[in-house]
Amino acid sequence: MERIERDTLGEISVDATKYWGAQTERSRRNFAIGDNYMPKEIIYAFAQLKKAAAKVNALEGKLSEAKSVAIGNVCDQIIQGELDEHFPLVVWQTGSGTQSNMNVNEVIAHVANLTLGEEKVHPNDDVNMSQSSNDTFPTAMHIAAYQALVTKLLSEITKMEEVLTTKKNQYMQLVKIGRTHLQDATPLTLGQEISGWEACLTNNKNYLESSMKAILPLAIGGTAVGTGLNASKDFGDKVAEELRKQTGYPFTSDSNKYFALTSHSPINFVHGAIRSLASDLMKIANDIRLLASGPRSGIGELTLPANEPGSSIMPGKVNPTQCEAITMVAAQVMGNDTTINIAASQGNFELNVYKPVIIFNFLESITLLSDSMRSFRIHCLEGLTANESVIEAKVNDSLMLVTALNPHIGYEKAAKIAKLAFDENTTLKEAAIKTGFVTEKEFDLWIDPLKMTNL
């Protein structure tokens, strides 16, 4: 069954079971590109915005109370996910996001009209009143981005941080050999090493919390080119106030709407902090899989939980699969950052027309990082253990303990001891005594791996 919808280009048939209208249907047919659909977070953010705008328009006497309430009720249904099937458009559409704005307008109008009597809601005249796609889409971008950061990414960072804190405390007294340039270095404790990973998360969370303030100012009220044509002078401020009430987040009206429509440097800036997190997660995961390499022919200082068979041909193999997954996600996020950076540079004159691809990649980064961090935390970090016998053996066998002799016999003599031990494949202690530079008693007094950690 189909019904006929009309727009300024004429008539078009639409599936009678769907709530969208003519402009959505034209976009659905004209942009059959891939399967990357407009993120639901954007649709829900649009609904929050349309509800707020309807309230303000009613307060200003431009929209009837009945229409405002009807629009708000449909927006609530959208936010709750009850109308997801009626938003079929892909990301690869007009760069202003106009078709998705109209998709939301049409669905809201259609469903609202199912409950109203003779007073019909129009997608443009009522739902889109005092608005343009040019200011609503960037507003929805900021709402969706901020909410995703708070509800997804920041909470996962905190949870992983807590696991690392536990591991740090558990292994704070376990001395191991440090490594710089992939070569043996002076000792530290495993807890100290883990504290570096922990600080990566703490600092990146701080970077995010600081940078995400940049996306609190909203473009709404700028309408088509930033002048606010067809909207009241304080429409943006009033809508931002309504959004603060709805969401509990401190959104404001951007003081310069020309900037808000043509530049996406705030999103670009915040994603830089997300990319930084991805970089550090790649570092942490790489450290863990290298320290767990083996179990007998690698470093073998850490033992990974065995979650699944590692090989289809080699029995008993356990692979660092969670490390591999999260590092692939990190690579994807770095790629997303490049896309966002390029797209953000395309603000020609009064409007950036790469908006959908910017927010698609931004939200994908948040989803992938949040999901992979949860998986990595549960299936890797929580079950990660130290192979203490291997760690102890490597400490005892290390030549870099000789560094502790520097203050007592000087760098050159200490270097000769290390070289002799290496050349003759003896212990550092045997080489030190053989050179006559130190006595056995002095060696035992000065070479204390735990003291060398300055713990």
Swiss-Prot record:
Keyword Repressor on entry: no
InterPro entries in UniProt: Fum_hydII (IPR005677), Fumarase/histidase_N (IPR024083), Fumarase_C_C (IPR018951), Fumarate_lyase_CS (IPR020557), Fumarate_lyase_fam (IPR000362), Fumarate_lyase_N (IPR022761), L-Aspartase-like (IPR008948)
Compartments it resides in: Cytoplasm
E.C. number(s) listed in UniProt: 4.2.1.2
Domain of life according to the entry: Bacteria
UniProt record, GO biological process: fumarate metabolic process; malate metabolic process; tricarboxylic acid cycle
Stated family: Belongs to the class-II fumarase/aspartase family. Fumarase subfamily.
Name under which the protein is recorded: Fumarate hydratase class II
Lineage per the UniProt record: Bacteria, Bacillati, Bacillota, Bacilli, Bacillales
